[in-house]
Amino acid sequence: MSWQNYLDKRLNERRNTPLWRKRQVIQHSNGRYLTTLSGDKYVNFSGNDYLGISQHPDVIQAWQRGANEYGVGSGGSGHITGFTQAHQQLEQQLADWLGYDHALLFSSGYSANQGVIATLLEKEDAIIADKLCHASLMEAAILSPASLWRFLHNSAPSLSQRLHKTSANKSLVVTEGVFSMDGDKAPLAAMAEISQQHQAWLMVDDAHGIGVLGKEGKGSCHEAGIKPELLIATFGKAFGISGAAVLCNKATAEFFEQYSRHLIYSTSMPPAQAVALHAALKVIKQDDEGREYLQQLISFFRQGVSSLPVTLLPSQTAIQPLIIGDELRCQQLSDYLQREGFWVKAIFPPTVPPHSARLRITLTTRHQISDIAMLIELLHGFFNQNR
């Protein structure tokens, strides 16, 4: 089979189905609203900017100051010319904030997850991962020479059984703090205890917990009262920017600096971005009011949709999935909301398990109660018309 025939075959399998992915050009977004290239304006219920920090004037001004001081790029890997005082200060601030020896900056959460697993695991080792872990974690685990075992979602007993069965040299337990498609929290305290009993390390990707959960927004692990050996803090959600950091002890940080290809051979984030992240961290630490308001929005939304004829997952976070199941019906609902001025994107397999197509509704502090009330009214209207 030629390359062209292969590509055509695979594309035709998906074309004209709800599974066909297409990027849409956004002309402007301020968190609450987004405007497409055609000029249409929508209330945005699909973004991850949970605290609205991407629009915060202090953060915007910090990026501008950083660009004026350092330029718009780092110019190289952190091991060559790309590690500036701005990077160093941000790493130290993150480590102090979260109670670790070190923080290492990566260009994205995907890169951080891939880098940790690719660097640490060898053939005699085992990765014990939650079945619903993010694609970045699962891809890294599959590509790793280590054995991969998956435990039932958020099941501490299933994790314990897997660890009992493994005879690996070293074991790494992998989970998310808040799961990106379900919005539920991992039982981190139980998982940490089980991991310690088996001398396994625990790795927590807290992309959707950092900034919005725990004291000062310190995240899922702080809220659960644990300190995993490896904590991934990403900056594309509550921080409102992009990039990530791996929090760990001194020896582990030195190991990554020596052996992590994702760290060594990647151009580091722009120094101006590090300056902006420092400003975002200051906002996050002080924004208890924003976190409290977000919880109020979550409660209001859940109460309003509780009687809908769909499955509302038991999430108490900003991620509120409505499980529709049927892919065509899910797309019809998303299209209906878009016609009414609401941007709520449908999520399909393989991003989520089979037969669990859903609307992944995300709430942010940029929303008003009136926005959510109208969304609730539209959802009820759709199901009343399409019983």
From Swiss-Prot:
Keywords: Biotin biosynthesis, Pyridoxal phosphate, Transferase. It catalyses: 6-carboxyhexanoyl-[ACP] + L-alanine + H(+) = (8S)-8-amino-7-oxononanoate + holo-[ACP] + CO2. It comes from the Bacteria. Its cofactor is pyridoxal 5'-phosphate. The keyword Transport does not apply. Its EC number is 2.3.1.47. Substrate binds at residues 21, 134, 351. The modification N6-(pyridoxal phosphate)lysine is found at residue 237. GO terms for biological process: biotin biosynthetic process. Pfam families: Aminotran_1_2. Signal peptide: none annotated. Pathway: Cofactor biosynthesis; biotin biosynthesis. It is an enzyme of class 2 (transferase). One of its GO terms (molecular function) is actin binding. The keyword Transferase applies. Pyridoxal 5'-phosphate binds at residues 109-110, 180, 208, 234. Belongs to the class-II pyridoxal-phosphate-dependent aminotransferase family. BioF subfamily. PANTHER family: 8-AMINO-7-OXONONANOATE SYNTHASE, CLASS II AMINOTRANSFERASE/8-AMINO-7-OXONONANOATE SYNTHASE. Homodimer. Catalyzes the decarboxylative condensation of pimeloyl-[acyl-carrier protein] and L-alanine to produce 8-amino-7-oxononanoate (AON), [acyl-carrier protein], and carbon dioxide. This is 8-amino-7-oxononanoate synthase. The lineage of its organism: Bacteria, Pseudomonadati, Pseudomonadota, Gammaproteobacteria, Enterobacterales. The gene is bioF.
